[in-house]
């Protein structure tokens, strides 16, 4: 079989006759074949519809390849697979007990797969984990085989690497790199799959970069674990794995997809169907059946009237009613027409639901067990939302203007959109109402505050008026008192000035009298010398008197001038003190006004929302 080397075994279970050696089948180095045959032999199983259960089919105890008494031993330096691990074998101990003991595996070929397995007694595997017991240590048993396997694989692929991996991979075309014999079959499988199939999380893959080496038999569920393995492989054949990761990423990018991160495609849910819209009769109508009453003399059927029908369903706010008539009169079919709005449709739907809950809906009317008459002879009315077929049936015998006009409209457009708009408008209305209420509350608060402030201001103004009047009265009293004091002191000063003036008059009179006495003493009696001496004495007396008078007047003027200067100085000091008093009064009044200044009313620009 051409692909036996890839699947590491024959086509049937051990002991079935296909495995004559009684152990693992030794794989020889196959001759290079055309790419088409390699792709079919190696990757044909991956893209088959039954590829999902591949981990359990070839490798578990129930598949085509069973473990015998010999234990499958891994290489000592091999890391755990980064893809999805193979499921644990089921009923391993049962398979081992039913199998005949196998002989020792023969030595592998020089260029084949180096399986360093050793024979172990049957049943030595652990029933719980499938691990070899003591005496079959995979670390010690396969130490030599691992080294040989790695060396042989590296030697076997040396010609491939020298041709395709020694130079810069970016210098080669994408197609050339993809058609490498290691990857060609893998990418042929990818090309045969659709994008949806590529992204299936249950599809399993082998790593082509691990071909003919450790990890070649590992399965990876989905491309993401395979990509992670190729990007993080770090022990052997690193360059080959990085090349695979680069090619796979480029291939998926060219096909308009990408490796979905692990977990994104698992646990998918199926939601509602995409199309939720439907066509409805517009304006909304409810068909009411069994509205016929009786036949008249002309064998014509009579039925319910328009207003009578509306009155029967007055709780549902129908705007109009119409009845279907034919050659035989009333056909027993009537229609309640509702407003052309979302509210009208909701009313019609509410009436329809009422009929459904009462089990007098369309299904009951169309059934063979419908009840048209109730005990007592009353007719049972049936109703349901109108459809296009109902309207065509209603208009069957109507022509021209007598036909009931209607149109088929989108439910989402006429009902859902309007209901959403109504909801938004209602929310906006509630918002505006709340805003208006808050504004009114704020206005009332401002009005109350303004009233209180105005009242306080009025009271303050009245108090200020009273204070000003009292201040004026006090000022008048002070002026009167000051005027009285001024008159009093003026009188006192006059009393001082008057005696002084009298003294001055007496003084001048005394001087004049003495001068007159001196002049009268000048007589012609006596000798000339005596007269001359008397005249000189009189003249000296007069001159001394004149001199004394001049000195008196000078000193008097000096005293008056000094007195006037003192008065001016005193007045200046008085005015300065009066100015200081006025200044102190102004400062005290300013402080008093600041102390009793009313609070400033601050109105917010807008109420809080």
UniProtKB/Swiss-Prot annotation:
Subcellular locations according to the entry: Cytoplasm
Gene3D superfamilies: XS domain (3.30.70.2890)
Coiled-coil regions listed: 420-473, 545-584
Sorted UniProt keywords: Coiled coil, Cytoplasm, RNA-mediated gene silencing
Compositional bias segments (type: Acidic residues): 138-168
Region described as Disordered: 1-174
UniProt keyword annotation of Coiled coil present: yes
Signal peptide: none
Function: Required for post-transcriptional gene silencing and natural virus resistance.
Family designation: Belongs to the SGS3 family.
Protein name: Protein SUPPRESSOR OF GENE SILENCING 3 homolog
């Amino acid at each position: 079989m051409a692909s036996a080397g890839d699947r590491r075994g024959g086509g049937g279970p051990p002991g079935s006759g296909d495995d004559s050696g009684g152990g693992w089948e030794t794989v020889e180095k196959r001759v290079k074949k055309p790419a088409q045959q390699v792709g079919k032999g190696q990757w044909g199983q991956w893209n088959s519809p039954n590829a999902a259960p591949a981990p359990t089919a070839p490798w578990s105890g129930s598949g085509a390849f069973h473990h015998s008494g010999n234990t499958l031993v891994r290489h000592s330096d091999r890391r755990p697979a980064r893809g999805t691990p193979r499921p644990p074998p089921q009923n391993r101990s049962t398979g081992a007990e039913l199998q005949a003991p196998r002989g020792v595996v023969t030595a592998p070929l020089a260029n084949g797969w180096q399986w360093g397995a050793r024979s172990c007694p049957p049943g030595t595997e652990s029933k719980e984990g499938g691990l070899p017991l003591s005496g079959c240590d995979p670390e010690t048993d396969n130490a030599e085989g691992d080294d040989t396997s790695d060396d042989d694989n590296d030697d076997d692929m040396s010609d491939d690497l020298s041709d395709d991996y020694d130079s810069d991979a970016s210098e080669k075309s994408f197609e050339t790199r993809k058609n490498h014999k290691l990857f060609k079959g893998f990418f042929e499988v990818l090309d045969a799959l659709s994008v949806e199939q590529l992204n299936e999380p249950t599809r399993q893959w082998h790593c082509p970069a691990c071909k003919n080496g450790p990890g070649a038999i590992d399965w990876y569920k989905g491309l993401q674990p395979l990509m992670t393995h190729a990007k993080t492989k770090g022990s052997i054949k690193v360059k080959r794995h990085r090349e695979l990761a680069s090619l796979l990423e480029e291939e998926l990018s060219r096909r308009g997809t990408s490796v979905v991160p692990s977990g994104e495609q698992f646990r998918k849910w199926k939601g509602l169907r995409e199309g939720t819209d439907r066509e409805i009769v517009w304006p909304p109508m409810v068909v009411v059946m069994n509205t016929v009453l009786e036949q008249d003399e002309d064998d014509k059927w009579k039925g319910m009237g328009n207003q009578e029908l509306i009155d029967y369903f007055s709780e549902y706010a129908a705007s109009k009613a119409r009845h279907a008539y034919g050659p035989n009169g009333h056909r027993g079919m009537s229609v309640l027409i509702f407003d052309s709005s979302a509210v009208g449709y909701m009313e019609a739907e509410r009436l329809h639901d009422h009929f459904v809950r009462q089990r007098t809906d369309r299904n009951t009317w169309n059934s063979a067990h419908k009840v048209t008459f109730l005990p007592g002879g009353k007719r049972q009315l049936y109703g349901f939302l109108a459809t296009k077929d109902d309207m065509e049936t209603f208009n069957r015998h109507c022509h021209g203007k007598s036909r009931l006009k209607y149109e088929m409209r989108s439910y989402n457009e006429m009902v859902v959109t309007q209901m959403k708009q109504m909801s938004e408008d209602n929310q906006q209305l509630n918002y505006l109402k709340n805003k208006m209420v808050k504004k009114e509350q704020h206005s009332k608060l401002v009005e109350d505050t303004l009233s209180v402030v105005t009242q306080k201001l009025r009271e303050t103004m009245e108090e200020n008026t009273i204070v000003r009047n009292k201040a004026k009265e006090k000022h008048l009293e002070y002026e009167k008192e000051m005027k009285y004091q001024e008159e009093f002191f003026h009188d006192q000063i006059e009393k001082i000035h008057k005696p002084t003036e009298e003294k001055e008059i007496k003084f001048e009179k005394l001087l004049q009298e003495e001068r007159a006495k001196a002049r009268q003493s000048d007589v012609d009696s006596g000798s000339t010398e005596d007269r001359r001496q008397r005249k000189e004495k009189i003249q000296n007396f007069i001159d001394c008197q004149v001199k004394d008078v001049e000195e008196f007047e000078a000193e008097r003027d000096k005293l008056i001038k000094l007195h006037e200067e003192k008065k001016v100085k005193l007045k200046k000091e008085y005015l300065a003190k009066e100015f200081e008093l006025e200044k102190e009064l102004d400062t005290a009044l300013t402080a008093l006004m600041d102390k009793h200044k009313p609070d400033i009313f601050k109105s917010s620009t807008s109420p809080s929302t």
